[in-house]
Amino acid sequence: MPKTKFRVESDLLGELQVPADAYYGVQTQRALNNYKISTTQMLHYPEYIIAIAYVKMAAAEANAELGVLDRTIADAIVKACQEIVDGKFHDQFPVDMMQGGAGTSVNMNANEVIANRALEIMGHNKGEYQYCSPNDHVNCAQSTNDAFPSAFRYTFVRMNRHVEKALSDLIASFRAKGQEFKDIIKMGRTQLQDAVPMTSGQEFNAFANNLEEEIANLERNAVLLKEVNMGGTAIGTGLNAVPGFAELCTIRLSEFTGDKFEKAPDLVEATPDTGAYVSYSAALKRLAIKLSKICNDLRLMASGPRCGLHEINLPPMAPGSSIMPGKVNPVIPEVTNQVCFKVIGNDTAVAFAAEAGQLQLNVMEPVIVQCILESQTWLINVMNTLRTKCIDGITVNVEHCYEMVKNSIGIVTALNPYIGYKASTKVAKEALETGRSVYDLVLEHGLMTQKKLDEALDPKAMTSAHAFIK
């Protein structure tokens, strides 16, 4: 007898064929039929799948301890969840990240996969839900409205660690370049005009310090995500959850994951609240803005090679033109800029979705999840790419940078304490009009002795605070 390719399952809307070997069930199949939207599936985010497995594991254990769920069924659910945490069955989470229903399809996808695997563990066949039901057992004392946000909050926390790691590595790369370039003199600029001298090391250390602030900012906002509303069920009132479940489930979730979670003090308030997502997304946006600005600087400093600033050399990664021979473009900073634009756009979508909540639930949470996970993933990837394919290989055109400083009118600023602002202005104007150097004009007009002028224009003296004697 040939093996059947499908099994038939039923729900509120009737019967539906499900692939016989699938661990998901009828409601996941409906979601697959309904939402062919983004081509981004839940299975593309392993951390998301792991997080929801932990939530279901904690709920099953808490329900068993409270006498609500049969211990044999609970143990099978916990074992199935552990297998998912260990990386199994991730291909059984095919639902589109973009969906209606406030995340119900995600929740039921998890419930069905866990139930069917638990059935096998107990010696039953997939779909024999009288022994372990996706709704009655795996989803016991839960609603999508508490299990779904608790899962993606934990997902964001897990992903944030990877964001911070990639950021820390990038900062270390900038610091290494700061040390490498500490004695290289270059011209600083404000408003794209020559300002005063600095070192390339100061510039790259500034990049590192600028980004360092974002680690603390990400951590501050990630803490907000560790408040969960498990036990609130549908709208936060706790209907169908026994007393003590909310507290115990949160404790077990903390134990299983190794992260400290807190039960929200007001579950009715917490159920529709999206404030933590808005804050965390804004932290990602702030990081993106800083990264993009740094990449703007890198592209400008690398401009040339003959007709631009040509201060630094970026590692050549690809031929730059199909028509212009020999052209090499700053492709890694460029792709970083574009990722940052996407993160900024995602944050705008998060803000609109957060504002769109109504009454006791915000049904727009799926797009919030998709946007934040995409922002985290893209930032991780692009920061690693920027570090390994750009920053680590940057070199400085030392002689060219020094020649620009030596020939710059901007160095006249260092003479203000010696000859005064008015005289310095006259020298600067004459240098600009005649093309002569500031150095020669100061000596010609007898404004300073050569010895004093050499001291005042000493490169090291010009790049830091120092005492001066008129």
PLM region descriptions:
Residues 1-470:
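Conserved, well-structured ligand/cofactor-binding cores
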